[in-house]
């Protein structure tokens, strides 16, 4: 599908769209209906990604990319400053042209390690760099690395790599890399019944084995924990493989508690909880039984080990300290979404965010059985106030079916972002996020839309995370089914609540959300025997796919398509009916397609096919290519083009 003809057409589309934006490219302001939106002030006011901050294990260094042109890699020494604008550039390469994932500073050898690629194409390898010289070493040459970690001494790295893939089948290998000699040893190749795909690794203190996650028959809904013996290369599954557990709800906790005892997380009871494993006896024991997903790391205070835990929900985050048996010593709720980054002694380090909090770093100290919270890293008040242009209104929206837990109509959580300065009533717009919504987190795209005076609906349809394993699994094998009905109900509810007619309601989303946008715009009116409709006025589909079966065979993560949609062979008819390419004649309004030409996760052909089909039908469609970009768009120039194109499209529709 990636032919010269197609790329030429896409580049022409991009050139046309870019030329229409060129006059105001420098000042960064975009004319939108009754106002100008200073998009560039958002991009320069906070030239980072809210999720792209990486804290070293010892909490002394913060690594992040800055969205300049070019986009450098920056390190902030937290022992000297807590102002992220004062970070030192440690690599002046243009990191907008490559991926930088899971970095970790090794204080033992002074190198920074990460997994990434060289051209945003997700050929993921393991790298390290000397921050003093910028010299970089690539240790591997494989199609994909799923996960990696250090040992306790930090003189070895463990990683699982995809070695070969033919169609849906692939082979993964577990490797041990000696960081001093650079000797790379293959420990084992995985088994067809339990693949090491998307693994996490926690090595034992004596480096004789590890806990890792494995997928039964490459099925993300049957994620298990296994113990791997390095000497024999054999691994034994220690959780019940007959019980469902999700990939997102299972994890290993590093370091181990002791020489023979390790802790891990599993949501096989419905929520991610803590369990312990004794490799000497083989015993697995439940430690916690919360009805809320949990994350945990070890904490030390007064010479004892404790579990530092955090549970998040739209209402906030519960931080609790537990003893090794799971007894809760103290718990505090904080009105933000907290991500536990590391622990040092009795201190927990979190990144914090909310719909109105861009980025903070917190320290929560466990002292005398109590928690003491303070903000370590924050932004200046003038930046914070200028970057928030709306307030969040929490909604509970009824959908079409009955929740078996309550016996009543299922209610969906959502946030409505209400602009400080809305458009006049006769110009009012509502933007509906098609998927991945409902988080209590800052979203720059939402704030740019509300700066333009538009309302933004961020809802959590079935399949969303944050509400337990079972809710997240409700859309498994039902892509484009009941999740789509949920979003139609949400859009109609808020459209009527605000008095904004459907022709001024648009949907937008990326990846799964890009597909869902295409699906909502071309919805045939019935799925799973249920009839409903909502005539969206326009849509913005980013990195989406229009043909589920084609996507399955052209993605570097085909197991995702299999889980979400179904078997492309035995369920072909269903998958084709759920594919927007099958219903182009029913599109309800103009559609803007945006895609990176280096995207290996969702191939650009998925947008090209829909563009061609809509053009053939005489339907209004536009196509922007993000040159040199993968599954996400980096760099200020790329982001200016992205937002300018979207705002111009919405204003014209």
State the predicted function of each range.
Residues 337-653:
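Serine-hydrolase catalytic core recognition
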Residues 78-81, 130-134, 178-182, 229-233, ...:
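Short loop/turn segments that connect beta-strands within beta-propeller blades
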Residues 47-65, 94-112, 142-163, 189-216, ...:
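Conserved beta-propeller blade repeats
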Residues 68-71, 119-124, 165-172, 217-223, ...:
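Short, solvent-exposed loop/turn segments at conserved positions within beta-propeller repeat blades
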Residues 18-20:
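C-terminal motif of bacterial Sec signal peptides marking the signal peptidase cleavage site
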Residues 27-48, 87:
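A short helix->beta-strand "capping" segment at the edge of beta-propeller domains
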Residues 64-93:
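Beta-propeller domains
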Residues 22-24:
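Bacterial signal peptide processing site
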């Amino acid at each position: 599908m990636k032919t010269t003809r197609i790329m030429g057409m896409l580049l022409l589309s991009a050139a046309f769209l870019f030329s229409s934006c060129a006059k105001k490219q420098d000042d960064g302001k975009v004319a939108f209906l009754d106002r100008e939106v200073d998009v560039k002030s958002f991009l320069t006011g906070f030239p980072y990604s809210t999720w792209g901050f990486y804290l070293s294990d010892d909490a002394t260094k913060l690594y992040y990319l800055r969205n300049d042109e070019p986009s450098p890699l920056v390190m902030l020494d937290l022992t000297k400053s807590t102002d992220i604008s004062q970070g030192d550039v440690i690599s002046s390469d243009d990191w907008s042209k490559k991926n930088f994932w899971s970095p970790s500073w090794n204080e033992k050898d002074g190198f920074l390690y990460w997994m990434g690629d060289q051209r945003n194409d997700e050929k993921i390898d393991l790298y390290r760099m000397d921050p003093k010289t910028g010299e970089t070493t690539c240790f591997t040459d494989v199609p994909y690395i799923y996960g990696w970690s250090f040992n306790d001494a930090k003189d070895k790295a463990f990683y699982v790599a995809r070695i070969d893939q033919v169609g849906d089948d692939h082979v993964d290998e577990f490797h041990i890399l000696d960081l001093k000699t650079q000797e790379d040893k293959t420990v084992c190749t995985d088994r067809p019944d339990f693949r090491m795909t998307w693994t996490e690794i926690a090595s034992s203190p004596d480096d004789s084995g590890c806990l890792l996650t494995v997928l039964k028959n490459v099925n993300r809904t049957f994620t298990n924990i296994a113990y791997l013996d390095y000497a024999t290369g054999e691994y034994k599954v220690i959780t019940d493989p007959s019980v469902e557990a999700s990939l997102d709800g299972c994890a290993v906790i590093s370091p181990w508690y002791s020489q023979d005892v390790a802790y891990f997380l599993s949501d096989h009871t419905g929520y991610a909880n803590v369990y312990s494993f004794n490799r000497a006896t083989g015993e697995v024991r439940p430690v916690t039984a919360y009805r809320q997903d949990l994350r945990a790391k070890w904490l030390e205070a007064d010479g004892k080990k404790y579990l530092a835990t955090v549970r998040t929900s739209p209402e906030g985050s519960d931080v609790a300290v537990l003893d090794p048996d799971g007894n809760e010593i103290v718990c505090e709720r904080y009105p933000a979404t907290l991500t536990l980054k590391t622990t040092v002694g009795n201190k927990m380090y979190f990144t914090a965010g909310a719909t109105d909090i861009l980025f903070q770093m917190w320290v929560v100290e466990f002292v005398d059985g109590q928690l003491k919270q303070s903000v370590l890293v924050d932004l200046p008040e003038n930046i914070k106030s200028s970057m928030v242009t709306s307030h969040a209104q929490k909604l509970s929206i009824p959908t079409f079916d009955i929740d078996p837990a309550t016996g009543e109509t299922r209610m969906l959580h959502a946030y409505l972002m209400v602009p400080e300065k809305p458009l006049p009533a006769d110009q009012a717009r509502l933007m509906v996020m098609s998927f991945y919504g409902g988080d209590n987190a800052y979203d720059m795209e939402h704030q740019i839309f509300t700066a333009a005076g538009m309302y933004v609906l961020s809802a959590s349809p079935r399949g969303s995370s944050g509400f337990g394993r079972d809710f997240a699994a409700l859309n498994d094998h039902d892509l484009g089914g009941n999740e789509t009905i949920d979003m139609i109900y949400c859009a109609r509810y808020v459209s009527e609540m605000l008095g904004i007619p459907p022709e001024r309601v648009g949907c937008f989303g990326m990846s799964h959300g890009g597909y869902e946008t295409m699906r909502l715009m071309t919805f045939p009116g019935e799925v799973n025997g249920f009839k409903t409709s909502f005539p969206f006025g326009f849509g913005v589909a980013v990195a989406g796919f229009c043909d589920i079966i084609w996507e399955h065979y052209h993605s570097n993560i085909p197991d995702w398509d299999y889980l979400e949609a179904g078997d492309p062979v035995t369920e072909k008819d269903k998958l084709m009916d759920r594919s927007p390419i099958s219903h182009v004649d029913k599109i309800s309004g103009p559609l803007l397609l945006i895609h990176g030409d280096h995207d290996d996760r969702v191939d650009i052909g998925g947008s090209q096919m829909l563009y061609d089909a809509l053009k053939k039908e005489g339907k209004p469609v536009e196509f922007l290519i993000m040159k040199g970009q993968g599954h996400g768009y980096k760099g200020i120039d790329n982001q200016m083009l992205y937002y300018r194109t979207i705002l111009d499209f919405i204003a014209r529709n």
